Swiss-Prot record:
<keyword id="KW-0408">Iron</keyword>
<keyword id="KW-0694">RNA-binding</keyword>
<protein>
    <recommendedName>
        <fullName>tRNA-cytidine(32) 2-sulfurtransferase</fullName>
        <ecNumber>2.8.1.-</ecNumber>
    </recommendedName>
</protein>
<comment type="subunit">
    <text>Homodimer.</text>
</comment>
<keyword id="KW-0808">Transferase</keyword>
<keyword id="KW-0067">ATP-binding</keyword>
<dbReference type="InterPro" id="IPR035107">
    <property type="entry name" value="tRNA_thiolation_TtcA_Ctu1"/>
</dbReference>
<dbReference type="GO" id="GO:0051539">
    <property type="term" value="F:4 iron, 4 sulfur cluster binding"/>
</dbReference>
<dbReference type="InterPro" id="IPR011063">
    <property type="entry name" value="TilS/TtcA_N"/>
</dbReference>
<feature type="binding site">
    <location>
        <position position="132"/>
    </location>
    <ligand>
        <name>[4Fe-4S] cluster</name>
    </ligand>
</feature>
<dbReference type="InterPro" id="IPR014729">
    <property type="entry name" value="Rossmann-like_a/b/a_fold"/>
</dbReference>
<feature type="short sequence motif" description="PP-loop motif">
    <location>
        <begin position="57"/>
        <end position="62"/>
    </location>
</feature>
<keyword id="KW-0479">Metal-binding</keyword>
<comment type="pathway">
    <text>tRNA modification.</text>
</comment>
<dbReference type="GO" id="GO:0000287">
    <property type="term" value="F:magnesium ion binding"/>
</dbReference>
<dbReference type="GO" id="GO:0016783">
    <property type="term" value="F:sulfurtransferase activity"/>
</dbReference>
<keyword id="KW-0963">Cytoplasm</keyword>
């Protein structure tokens, strides 16, 4: 039976708190629950009878994700179960007791997968290079295998609004493509459905909530400490935009849900040759339109 995490309680404070300060954590929790519930409803993330696997890393995002889903589970319009799963990648100095202790105290069903991906990544990736990509692939493979073996129907990840927007700019700047993170998707092999219930949640709100709830945060010493990573650079850019023009990142996030293919230039999404009649006429060879082409030189 899946246990329910109690509502956040006011944190102990040696100094008297004003009514406004006492209410703020409750307002934040309510705002987060509303955003998560809205995302679940908008994208049909959870269906009746789903077994949702919450991928728990020990960071603020995955703690908040688990907390929100446990709270929403009590009032959700459909029944679903939750299991928290952590992949112990055998990183040096990883505090292996932190997550089990926390999850047992909260009476949350959980499993710990032990797989030494750290040694693989350290052996394959040259020193000083970014480990994130290979680490992510190995982690994803282990979690997918667990989901397949345990009848999991939805895999919940802790990516938030800022992650999604940052991924959009990563693809734009470094791969010349318009792509981000889908709030809900089917894995490449078609076997798993991945959901991101924090898709509408700001990272700043998650950080404030994690601090208020005093989650036992586990830092990532494998990839998070590497400097000058492209994602960190994009993150700083977005933070600066938000400081200089509040609301800009919100606008970008909303734009990702309002795509106009006919106003872009992707020929696989829009029939440009079919515009203006003559759609059935054969198109001339492209070389005929190229200035300085071999065909032009042949005529000369």
């Amino acid at each position: 039976m899946t246990a329910v995490l109690p509502l956040p309680l006011p944190l102990a404070d040696p100094a008297p708190r004003t009514p406004r300060l006492q209410r703020e954590p409750l307002r934040l929790a309510k705002r987060l629950r509303h955003a998560v519930g809205q995302a679940i409803a908008d994208f049909g993330m959870i269906a009746p009878g789903d077994k949702v696997m919450v991928c728990l890393s020990g960071g603020k995002d995955s703690y908040t994700l688990l907390d929100m889903l446990l709270q929403l589970q009590r009032s959700a319009p459909v029944p679903f179960t939750l299991v928290a799963v952590n992949l112990d990648q055998k990183q040096p100095d990883f505090p292996a007791d932190v997550l089990p202790t926390y999850l047992r105290a909260q009476q949350v069903p959980f499993d710990i997968i032990e797989q030494d991906t750290y040694s693989v990544v350290s052996r394959v990736i040259p020193q000083g290079k970014t480990m994130c990509s290979l680490c992510s692939r190995l982690r994803r493979g282990a979690l997918y295998a667990y989901a397949q073996a345990h009848g999991v129907t939805k895999i919940a990840l802790g990516h938030h609004r800022d992650d999604i927007v940052a991924t959009f700019f990563m693809n734009l700047f470094h791969h010349a493509r318009l792509a981000a993170m889908a709030p809900k998707l089917r894995s490449d092999d078609g076997a798993h459905v991945v959901i991101r219930p924090l898709a509408y949640v700001r990272e700043a709100d998650i950080a404030a909530y994690a601090q208020a709830r005093q989650f036992p945060i586990i830092p990532c010493n494998l990839c998070g400490s590497q400097e000058n990573l492209q994602r960190q650079q994009v993150g700083r850019m977005l933070q600066q935009w938000d400081r200089e023009q509040p609301g800009r990142v919100d606008q970008i996030a909303r734009a990702l849900g309002d795509v106009r293919p006919e106003q872009l230039a992707d020929r696989t999404l829009f029939d440009f040759p079919g515009l203006g009649g003559g759609a059935d006429a054969p198109l001339p060879d492209a070389a005929g339109w190229l200035a300085g082409s071999a065909a032009e030189h042949a005529r000369d």
